[in-house]
């Protein structure tokens, strides 16, 4: 991907269990060589020793640690998350499992505003974005970016084995990106 497009950001998303199997310094060295820009460990609280080690290793290598801020995040914790985040804040639009609920436009806008009151770090909104229309509504919240994940994963799962999956998936992605121009 990096050789194809030097401008697109590459974010690796995973779970803390992976870091128990892979020495953190080696992990960061390897992902830097591979061209990654940032890491998001979705289930690691910032108080966790391993996340602190990861954050330091990423910072030492000029890479970003992306943190989640959910609607249930209290003000003190939000401020702590902002202090240790780099790259952008991943603003979670809905409580619960990604891909299940739809985002509420007013709630998203209010949460984006509350984050932007206390930081200049970009805010990217994700969770609950099931359609291009949802993406457009979220984009209008004042966020700096829209993250679509589960919808694309579901599309691929539902169409595995279909002829021309790559082309049809490209059209699916384009339907989202066109409304965001």
Where are these regions (language model features)?
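Histidine/lysine/aspartate-rich catalytic loop segments that bind and position anionic ligands
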Residues: 60-99
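Acidic (Asp/Glu)-rich catalytic clusters
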Residues: 2-6, 32, 55-56, 82-85, ...
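Active-site beta->alpha loop and helix N-cap motifs at the rims of alpha/beta catalytic domains
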Residues: 1-44, 171-174, 178-180
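Catalytic cores of alpha/beta
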Residues: 73-84, 125, 129-146
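Active-site-adjacent beta->alpha loops and helix N-cap segments on the catalytic face
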Residues: 1, 19-25, 43-60, 74-79, ...
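Alpha-helix-loop-beta-strand connector modules within alpha/beta enzyme cores
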Residues: 1-11, 56-70, 104-123, 131, ...
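Glycine-rich phosphate-binding active-site loops on the catalytic face of alpha/beta enzymes
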Residues: 37-48, 90-99, 128, 141-161
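Structural preference for beta-strand elements that scaffold enzyme active sites
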Residues: 9-13, 37-38, 64-66, 87-89, ...
């Amino acid at each position: 991907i990096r050789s194809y497009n030097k401008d697109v950001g590459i974010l690796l998303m995973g779970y803390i269990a992976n870091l128990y199997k892979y020495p953190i310094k080696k992990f960061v060295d390897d992902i830097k060589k591979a061209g990654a820009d940032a890491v998001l460990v979705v289930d690691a609280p910032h108080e966790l020793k391993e996340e602190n080690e990861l954050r330091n290793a990423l910072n030492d290598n000029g890479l970003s640690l992306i943190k989640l801020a959910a609607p249930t995040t209290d003000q003190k914790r939000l401020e702590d998350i902002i202090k240790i985040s780099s790259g952008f804040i991943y603003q979670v639009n809905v409580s619960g499992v990604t891909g299940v609920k739809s985002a509420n436009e007013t709630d998203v806008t209010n949460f984006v505003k509350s984050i932007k009151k206390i930081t200049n770090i970009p805010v990217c909104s994700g969770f609950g974005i099931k359609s291009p229309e949802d993406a457009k509504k979220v984009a209008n919240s004042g966020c700096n970016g829209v993250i679509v994940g589960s919808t694309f994963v579901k599309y691929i799962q539902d169409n595995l084995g279909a002829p021309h999956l790559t082309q049809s998936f490209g059209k699916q992605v384009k339907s989202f990106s066109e409304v965001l121009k």
